[in-house]
Amino acid sequence: MASRRLLSSFLRSSTRRSLRPSFSNPRPSFLTSYCSSPASILRRYATAAPAKEPAASKPAGTAGTGKGTITDEKTGAGAIGQVCQIIGAVVDVKFEEGLPPIMTALEVIDFEIRLVLEVAPSLGENTVRTIAMDGTEGLVRGQKVLNTGAPITIPVGRATLGRIINVIGEPIDHRGEIKTDQYLPIHREAPTFVDQATEQQILVTGIKVVDLLAPYQKGGKIGLFGGDWVGKTVLIMELINNVAKAHAVFAGVGERTREGNDLYKEMMESGVIKLGDQQAESKCALVYGQMNEPPGSRARVGLTGLTVAEHFRDAEGEDVLLFVDKRFRFTQANSEVSALLGRIPSAVGYQPTLATDLGGLQERITTTKKGSITSVQAIYVPADDLTDPAPATTFAHLDATTVLSRQISELGIYPAVDPLDSTSRMLTPESGEEHYNTARGVQKVLQNYKNLQDIIAILGMDELSEDDKLTVARARKIQRFLSQPFHVAEIFTGAPGKYVELKECVTSFQGVLDGKYDDLPEQSFYMLGGIEEVIAKAEKMAKENPQ
């Protein structure tokens, strides 16, 4: 009986509290705030004390400090939305007004980290589905979200050289913020036909085997095929050192944290990246979307790296090198995003927009009248199946392929580029008759030597004809002459790096084909630059070992 009286007393007191006027409780509870309509949240947020204004160097509307008023009717910039559903990396946001367009960046307000959401499709009824660029742990329904009214915007320019940034342009190298007033959105249109340069030019790298047999095109796309420990990283750093006088960008798409850290340290040791007061002399900017990042981050980090490179091309008017490692992980990340958005998969489980996703990025890598972006992309072939949709779609965009061979690496010949498997569209008579004939002559000699190796292994050199013996001797000299010491490897080998001009390279190999240097020992051709160094080394060897 006592318990019944206690319960009825509690109910009467609760009823009286619920009938009190709202002004008697000026501090609403969390439940009241959470259950309010988006319109009331927007009004309350708009009348709150203004937040601190963003720095002048930051792009407008990217700091999550909006006042709740729409500043652009077309994009809905400044509108405040509310998280209504969270499914892993997918976040649904509801707006009472100011619905953002696709690819607009939204920022979660008052969150423990800077969480950027990119708008995907609209779900109707003022709700948009977004992809998170970072982890959504700790995000709750009802959390406020600001419509920035613009795509993801990142810092660009010389301030990014020597720094590591993530997909949204935040520095992750613990060396302070990037101080610049230059920003660009990562979603941009490809250069128009009028702006593009139609003249094809060879991009001289100073690396003999590349320039002679598989030359790169300015503004072209190069596929870099190579396994572990065959010199891929050293080749990348040498290209940065030789070609990119001040501008190169490395985009690690789905990069292992350990690999990214190792590359950063190797670049510092080789002088590609400099710290402290000499940071302005750095030659490379690094953009990482690590393997443990959400798929949205890995799918967009390639665009972030490309945007940094585009600024150097368009504003600085320079030839930029863009390295993407790995291209397959970019496709994989977009496939994950497509599955999260509920799209029906296409062949072999890839997203139905595979060609569009890849083409949108590749078409921005081109030569304009101001400068060029030359892309070197590491290509992974799943199960060695060249008909797989991912590599097959990529091959359609490539202008050259550089294949690193483990067999050549085991011979101690570096760079370990396979001269027979590497190809280029630039190797045509139109690019230079002498260059073309010399390159084809070198490949013919090497192919004949490869065909004779089985006979040599079974019968020996003595059973070969005189012409075949001459072919083998010249091929072995050519094989060793294709080796070259790198500038970035000086600290490991002690040998000074060599840069060989294209004309000197062609003349030297033509001389070997013509038999001008048949009397020189093949050891004198190993790890040198031009033919003059070979002659000098042969004379030195003759003096040291007189016969």
Swiss-Prot record:
Any GO BP? proton motive force-driven mitochondrial ATP synthesis
Per its record, the protein catalyses:
ATP + H2O + 4 H(+)(in) = ADP + phosphate + 5 H(+)(out)
Main localisation, per the record?
A: mitochondrion
Lineage top rank: taxon: Eukaryota
What would be one Gene Ontology cellular-component term for the protein? Answer: mitochondrial inner membrane
Annotated EC: 7.1.2.2
Tell me the residues of the organelle transit peptide: 1-45
Show the PROSITE patterns listed in the entry. ATPASE_ALPHA_BETA (PS00152)
Arranged from A to Z, the UniProt key words for this protein are: ATP synthesis, ATP-binding, CF(1), Hydrogen ion transport, Ion transport, Membrane, Mitochondrion, Mitochondrion inner membrane, Nucleotide-binding, Transit peptide, Translocase, Transport
Q: Where does ATP bind?
A: G226, G227, D228, W229, V230, G231, K232, T233
Q: Where is this region: Disordered?
A: 52-74
Enzyme class per UniProt? translocase
One of the record's GO molecular function terms: ATP binding
A Pfam family reported for this protein in Swiss-Prot or TrEMBL = ATP-synt_VA_C
List all Low complexity biased stretches: 52-62
Q: What does this protein do?
A: Mitochondrial membrane ATP synthase (F(1)F(0) ATP synthase or Complex V) produces ATP from ADP in the presence of a proton gradient across the membrane which is generated by electron transport complexes of the respiratory chain. F-type ATPases consist of two structural domains, F(1) - containing the extramembraneous catalytic core, and F(0) - containing the membrane proton channel, linked together by a central stalk and a peripheral stalk. During catalysis, ATP synthesis in the catalytic domain of F(1) is coupled via a rotary mechanism of the central stalk subunits to proton translocation.
The record describes its quaternary structure and partners as:
F-type ATPases have 2 components, CF(1) - the catalytic core - and CF(0) - the membrane proton channel. CF(1) has five subunits: alpha(3), beta(3), gamma(1), delta(1), epsilon(1). CF(0) has three main subunits: a, b and c.
Q: What is this protein called in UniProt? A: ATP synthase subunit beta, mitochondrial
The opening ranks of the lineage are: Eukaryota, Viridiplantae, Streptophyta, Embryophyta, Tracheophyta
